[in-house]
Amino acid sequence: MAASVSTIGAASKAPLSLNNSVAGTSVPSTAFFGKSLKKVYAKGVSSPKVSNRNLRVVAQEVDETKEDRWKGLYDNTSDDQQDIARGKGLVDSLFQAPTGTGTHHAIMNSYEYVSQALKTYQLDNKLDGFYIAPAFMDKLVVHITKNFLTLPNIKVPLILGVWGGKGQGKSFQCELVFRKMGINPIMMSAGELESGNAGEPAKLIRQRYREAAEIIRKGNMCCLFINDLDAGAGRMGGTTQYTVNNQMVNATLMNIADNPTNVQLPGMYNKQENARVPIIVTGNDFSTLYAPLIRDGRMEKFYWAPTREDRIGVCKGIFRTDNVPEEAVVKIVDSFPGQSIDFFGALRARVYDDEVRKWVSGTGIELIGEKLLNSRDGPPTFEQPKMTLEKLLEYGNMLVQEQENVKRVQLAETYLKEAALGDANADAINTGISKNFTNLKSRLNNEEAKKARHVNFQE
């Protein structure tokens, strides 16, 4: 038994040759099996030759930070709100605020913080191609903003009075500023400041003011805009009758300016305060208004006289769709320096007269109504006429000549003074008056002579 064990040990100690290996290995004979074992050869099996070169295994370290879910924490410059937003859904909800509270919803990303939050805004005085005078916009924006602010120990005038010459674009400039600020004003006109019923205009002002206050209470900016206040509440010489409604309109505006947050309607008296509503009024001559209304504590006054740059800017907006060069616009403005801004709008409209005249001659005067109102094809369309500098200057001179005719003739004074057209019948009137006076004098003399004869007869 001992021999068999040693034999097995010898068999197990047989050296292995990897380089010179053969298909099979011989098994030594042992006493345990009784006879020597046959050599077994594996057919069709060959071991690949292994190179004598030394094998070197290289392990490359993987940089896991490139795939890190929190990589934005070290390569992005942002605030805590951005970092918390990245961790939404990755952190236990126990340590997060409820959804929708704003903590995990970023308002801006890092680029927007740099490009928008640090942006300085300038007063852009253009709106849809129309020009807004910087001084005009500054006055309105500051006045409206002041009335919505709470300034310490400062009484802000509630009313802003914009006044100036006729046709200078006061109302249109106000509308542009309102659109620029996103304000939808409550508008009134001078025709609403008079009524057949005493007290109606004053009540209407209070109603409109409270409507604007309700809009402000709902979170939208609003103001009360009154056009041509002096035409409805002012006194234009001795020919204007001063009525009770004029007095009540002035008194109502004064009361609202003194108590802007306590405006009551007739029959409705409560202590609930309303929102403060800035009031913008326009006019041509505020000296015709009641003096206590326009004092500094109640009304801030702004005289609007457009400069040459303002007139050029507004005219560029008027001719913006007509392909008129800027040099031509400047030439037109300088050619009519004493005209109002409205003059240039009328000048542009006058250019279309030729197109309308051509359409009328081609249609016929008898068919104008049918073509304009009852045509299946709709109203006629016109091609935009070509506006040249020469044509605009020609029509401008025609408008100036018409203005001069009105100033020169002054038929109204002639009508009131002579009841005749000009001096055509002046001689006839004077002759008629002298004849009538002579006849009246002779008639009086005859009556006196008759009375004298009658007295003498009685005596």
Curated annotation (Swiss-Prot):
Q: Which domain of life is it from?
A: Eukaryota
The GO terms this record gives for MF are: ATP binding; ATP hydrolysis activity; ribulose-1,5-bisphosphate carboxylase/oxygenase activator activity
Instruction: Give its localization.
Output: Plastid, Chloroplast stroma
Tell me if ATP-binding is a UniProt keyword of this record. Answer: yes
Annotated Gene3D superfamilies: 1.10.8.1070, P-loop containing nucleotide triphosphate hydrolases
Ligand binding (ATP) = G164, G165, K166, G167, Q168, G169, K170, S171
UniProt keyword terms in alphabetical order: ATP-binding, Chloroplast, Nucleotide-binding, Plastid, Transit peptide
Which InterPro entries is this protein grouped with?
Answer: ATPase_AAA_core, P-loop_NTPase, RCA-like, RuBisCO_activase_AAA_helical
GO CC annotation: what is one? chloroplast stroma
Q: Does the keyword Transit peptide apply?
A: yes
To which protein family does this belong?
Belongs to the RuBisCO activase family.
Q: What does this protein do?
A: Activation of RuBisCO (ribulose-1,5-bisphosphate carboxylase/oxygenase; EC 4.1.1.39) involves the ATP-dependent carboxylation of the epsilon-amino group of lysine leading to a carbamate structure.
Q: What is this protein called?
A: Ribulose bisphosphate carboxylase/oxygenase activase, chloroplastic
Species of origin: Solanum pennellii
According to the entry, what is the taxonomic lineage of the organism? Eukaryota, Viridiplantae, Streptophyta, Embryophyta, Tracheophyta
